């Protein structure tokens, strides 16, 4: 029987830097870390990643240095085997800290897997009327997300398919456009400034 967790030493897992969509059949990386509520040194903690079938797809040990700007998030960059099928996936992350003060911890991670990219899409966003490039526009090309740079452009690599292209930025009307991607291409989007709400007139 495992030792009960000391309530003063509650451990938790954080997972970040997993690209989504993940390309099927390719190895990818993510970062995972373990922290104790009492700030314990968790260097050497085992962190393992399992897919929906319970198959281990990656793992490693937390390093000696906490993640920058944290006092006790001990982390590792892990290589993992990507799924072989497209769509949504839910994996589990399991961590075991050294010693008996901390119970084993489990968390989940959800992501999308996609076919390998085939074509490069350049997206140009300008403002209606002025023609000025619009920076920092959040773009979604199907499951792929990107944002425009200061020149109002962004690039994304996608497999050939029909995609809904959505653009959003505060102060502009949301824009949706359908595009059939069968080769390298450029998509130009024209965004309209959102009208300011009418102010009520008070006597």
List each model region and its residues:
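A short, amphipathic beta-strand motif
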Residues: 32, 119-127
């Amino acid at each position: 029987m495992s030792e009960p967790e000391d309530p003063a030493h509650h451990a938790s897992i954080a997972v970040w830097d997993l690209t989504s969509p993940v390309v099927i059949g390719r190895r990818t990386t993510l970062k995972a870390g373990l922290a104790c509520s009492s700030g314990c040194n968790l260097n050497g903690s085992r962190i393992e990643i399992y897919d929906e079938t319970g198959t281990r797809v990656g793992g490693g040990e937390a390093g000696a240095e906490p993640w920058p700007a944290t006092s006790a998030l001990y982390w590792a960059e892990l290589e993992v085997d990507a799924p072989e099928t497209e769509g949504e996936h839910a994996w589990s992350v399991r961590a075991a800290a050294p010693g008996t003060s901390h119970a084993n911890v489990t968390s989940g991670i959800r992501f999308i897997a996609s076919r390998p990219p085939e074509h490069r899409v350049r997206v140009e966003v300008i403002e209606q009327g002025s023609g000025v490039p619009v920076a920092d526009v959040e773009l979604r090309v199907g499951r792929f997300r990107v944002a425009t740079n200061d020149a109002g452009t962004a690039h994304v690599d996608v497999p050939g398919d029909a995609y809904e292209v959505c653009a959003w930025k505060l102060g502009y009307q949301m824009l949706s456009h359908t595009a059939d991607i069968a080769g390298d291409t450029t998509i130009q989007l024209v965004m309209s400034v959102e009208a300011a709400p009418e102010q009520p007139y008070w006597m």
